[in-house]
UniProtKB/Swiss-Prot annotation:
Alphabetical list of Gene3D superfamilies matching this protein: 3.30.420.40
Keyword field: ATP-binding, Kinase, Nucleotide-binding, Transferase
Lineage start: Bacteria, Bacillati, Cyanobacteriota, Cyanophyceae, Synechococcales
Domain of life: Bacteria
Name under which the protein is recorded: D-ribulose kinase
Sequence positions that bind ATP: 243, 281, 376-380
Region forming the signal peptide: none
Pfam families from the UniProt entry: FGGY_C (PF02782)
SUPFAM superfamilies noted in UniProt: Actin-like ATPase domain
Organism annotation: Synechococcus elongatus (strain ATCC 33912 / PCC 7942 / FACHB-805) (Anacystis nidulans R2)
Biological role: Exhibits ATP hydrolysis without substrate. Phosphorylates D-ribulose.
Gene for this chain: PSK
Residue numbers binding substrate: 8, 12-15, 72, 221
């Protein structure tokens, strides 16, 4: 029986799920990060060792493949042995650079043309240091953690490498970037799930793991959550109804739109495209605690319209499906009846999701066929009915949404379920 281990490193903690896919059995453990740290690599490494220690010994000894997912855009510089030479720059840290400086290295619509991208952070470090030693390397969070297990320098996957300037359709970095002073620091890029190498003997012995256990190329946390859902057909999508609304659609065609933050990740023979609105559960919680949301939702008749026309932003600014940094919340008029008010908010959020999928299809993505729902809002049956009425495709709660489970699935099976005849790009 093959056991695969998926490790998910998020912003507030880490989780590990070991899965025996032959018997549908699994074991899960987790750790929480401190809110702040002066040494994030040490926090991550200690969390990695804690997770391995917490997995029962009889499970550990049967693990044959391991993969790690991490936060997209969180990167650090280290030497070839993996010793950090800088503090990491986190996913949401913008770098004060001129994006025009990156224009010769990536296409005009590339996801790396952002002040928070990994490439922007590498260029920022180059400006800060004056010159970077050619025997250093830039690694994403997941890459660096994998290095602790396999010991192979400069290894990444094409999901984490996208924001570093990697072009998945061409399967390479541009010649201009490779020939630049940054080229020596770039990683070798693998398909997610491909084995990079065996676990280091000392690590295997310390934690009671098989010396034949393979460490595989990883992915990002958001893609791992998509993999956990089981969606694998073009036209299938996952909507995450959390503090914000995040859409991910499996498409036969890659689409992009820098204005609204839409870009596409290669996923085997398909593309995973999507966008994220600022609207979501954060707006609902401004007005209702969770218990009240549940009780009021039960009183809504979804077959009758509220008559309200809201755009429920939590504060100024929207990014997708409408790019408008000055857009204000539209939450008036507010009726005295809280049931009607909540219905108006849910209808507004539903409209945002509807417009989002329409925007992806306007850009040329594969038509939407089915939605799997993740996040706290997935449990709201009335909201689901409103969404199904508006969007017009089957909607169901995703059977699994744990990123660590998706990464365990990636370690076990790679991207075999996503390979098709060919890739297209608009």
């Amino acid at each position: 029986m093959v056991v695969a281990l998926g490790l998910d490193f998020g912003t507030s903690g880490a989780r590990a799920i070991a899965c025996d896919f032959d018997s549908d059995r699994s074991v899960s453990v987790s750790v929480t990060f401190p809110k702040t740290s002066q040494n994030w690599p040490q926090v991550w490494r200690e969390a990695l060792w804690q997770l391995l220690t917490q997995i029962p010994a009889d499970w550990r000894s049967r693990i044959e493949r391991i993969a790690i997912d991490g936060t997209s855009g969180t990167v650090l510089l280290c030497d070839r042995e993996g010793q950090p030479q800088t503090e990491p720059l986190l996913y949401n840290q913008a770098c004060p650079i001129d994006l025009a400086d990156l224009a010769d290295w990536v296409p005009a619509d590339h996801a790396a043309l952002s002040s928070t991208s990994s490439l922007a952070k590498l260029w920022f470090w180059q400006q800060q240091f004056g010159a970077l030693p050619p025997d250093w390397q830039i690694l994403a969070q997941a890459d660096w953690l994998s290095l602790q297990l396999h010991g192979c320098s400069q290894q990444s996957d094409y999901h984490n490498a996208l924001k570093l300037g990697y072009s998945p359709d061409r399967e390479r970095f541009s010649k201009n970037l490779l020939d630049s002073e940054l080229g020596a620091l770039l990683p070798v890029v693998h398909e997610p799930g491909v084995a990079i190498g065996p676990i280091l003997p000392a690590i295997a012995q310390e934690f009671g793991l098989s010396p034949d256990c393979q460490i595989c190329a990883g992915t990002t946390d958001s893609i791992a959550a998509f993999l956990a859902s089981g969606a694998h057909q073009p036209g299938e999508a996952v909507t995450s109804l959390g503090s914000t609304i995040v859409l991910k659609l499996l498409s036969q065609v890659a689409v992009s739109d820098r204005l609204t933050g839409v870009y596409s990740h290669k996923l085997g023979g398909y593309w995973l495209t999507g966008g994220a609105s600022n609207c979501g559960g954060a707006t609902l919680r401004q007005f209702f605690p969770d218990t009240e949301l549940e009780s009021l939702s039960c009183q809504i008749d979804p077959t009758k319209k509220s008559g309200l026309d809201y755009y429920p932003l939590p504060s100024r600014g929207e990014r997708f499906p409408i790019a408008d940094p000055d857009r204000l919340p539209q939450l008036e008029p507010r009726p005295e009846n809280p049931v009607q008010f909540l219905q108006g908010l849910l209808e507004g959020l539903t409209q945002v999701e509807t417009l989002g999928y329409q925007r992806l299809q306007d850009l040329g993505a594969t038509p939407l066929k089915r939605i799997w729902t993740a996040g706290g809002g997935a449990k709201n049956a009335v909201w689901q009915q409103l969404r199904q009425q508006a969007i017009g495709v089957p909607i169901a709660i995703a059977p699994n949404t744990e990123a660590a489970f998706g990464t365990a699935r990636l370690a076990a099976f790679g991207l075999a379920a996503f390979h098709s005849a060919g890739l297209k790009r608009t």
